């Protein structure tokens, strides 16, 4: 019986070691461009901005020098909510590091609902790439396996971070491995249709009247001939889509 207790205790110890996480607050410098054009034509002259986020690495006790894939998460117009954290926890349980980008808190903003001008999508895209640049140098992160996901406004950040005129104005060297945009605003219809060749996937609710699905369908059809982009429209679903998917 004593041996059985020892075996159980050992198994619990091994599980706990393998389930450990390290949490780091990462600070970096970004800026406050108002528009995409500010980034493309005048990035160096934009007002500088200190930004931070939280990096969580699900340490594997077996592989001491292991580098982890990473997902950078970008919240929507109300900032970070419970369902966003459930996604990050899901990724962490899969052995993927996560980075909670805090574009709002860094600027003392709680919400942009109804205005959308306290911080713009352009500034948040810049934040995401500046975070990527810092995290690419982290000893536990595999810079070739860094993806981005976001919700609503953050979904727009995720989607248009793949637009090459923006990406190349910010950083020509680093590319996100994939882009998962959850109910993004797809109202931007660029004449230049050059997007990253990394996989881009849009997930949206058919009945969503805040970020409608039709513009996303139109955009995917426009880009699909030369871009690795796809769309999933969930029938009879509104903005509560991410919560439904996690039940």
Give the label of every model feature segment.
Residues 41-44, 51, 66-136:
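Serine-hydrolase catalytic machinery in alpha/beta-hydrolase-like enzymes
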Residues 212-221:
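Short alpha-helix in the alpha/beta-hydrolase fold that links the catalytic acid
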